[in-house]
Each structure stands twice: as structure tokens, then as C-alpha cells.
Amino acid sequence: MDMRVLAQLLGLLLLCFPGARCDIQMTQSPSSLSASVGDRVTITCRASQGISNYLAWFQQKPGKAPKSLIYAASSLQSGVPSKFSGSGSGTDFTLTISSLQPEDFATYYCQQYNSYP
């Protein structure tokens, strides 16, 4: 069974909080990919400058609000299956789905929330 998993950077929707460094550009790849159930899927996100580990990953399904998967680059949100994992620091980050399942069809995006010291 083939599924299409979208990895999309929603740069225009990134929020600017007081003190946040909103000049940081995020680049996510691939923009889209095709994968099969059981595949290991990796999505990468690169920041234009170092953001330490201030990086979150979200999953969004059509008609639904975004769901937080990972915070602080590698910390799994409560209730999120362990098939999801995050890694990286500085400028390069990855989200990995260890064994893709039909319910994982979604858009995935990263968000930086680095702030000034």
C-alpha cells in the first residue's frame, strides 16, 4: 500500500513571539515524498543560523489542528508514539518515523522558537 506523506514548511504561519528571532529562515526537505507502509521516513529541517535545540515538529491532518510531536529537537510529547523521533542541534534537524503506518498520512513541519538570551 503506497501512501503519500507531505513534508511542508509553513513559513508564513510561524509565529513571532516577543523576543523571538524572526529573522531565522527554516528550510525543510523533501517538500514531498512517497513511501510505503513499514518504511522508515526521514524529514530534515535546516535553520539559517544556529538555534540550539529550540526546534519543534508538528503533524497536521486535513481539517485538523496541528499536533505537536517533538519539542526541544528530540523530546517526545506525551502520548506521541515512540515510532516518532527527533534529533539534531544548531542548524540541522531530523524527524524520523521508524515504521510508517496508514494513520501517519499527514503534513509534517518544523518550527523554530529560539529567543534572545
From Swiss-Prot:
Q: Which domain of life is it from?
A: Eukaryota
Q: What InterPro entries does this protein map onto?
A: Ig-like_dom, Ig-like_dom_sf, Ig-like_fold, Ig_sub, Ig_V-set, IgV_Light_Chain
CDD domains in alphabetical order: IgV_L_kappa
Q: Note the Pfam families from the entry.
A: V-set
Which GO annotations describe the biological process of this protein? Answer: adaptive immune response; immune response
Q: Where in the cell is it found?
A: Secreted; Cell membrane
Stretches the record annotates as Framework-1: 23-45
Q: What is its main location?
A: secreted
Instruction: Cite the Ig-like domain residue spans from the record.
Output: 24-117
Assembly and partners are described as: Immunoglobulins are composed of two identical heavy chains and two identical light chains; disulfide-linked.
- Name of protein: Immunoglobulin kappa variable 1-16
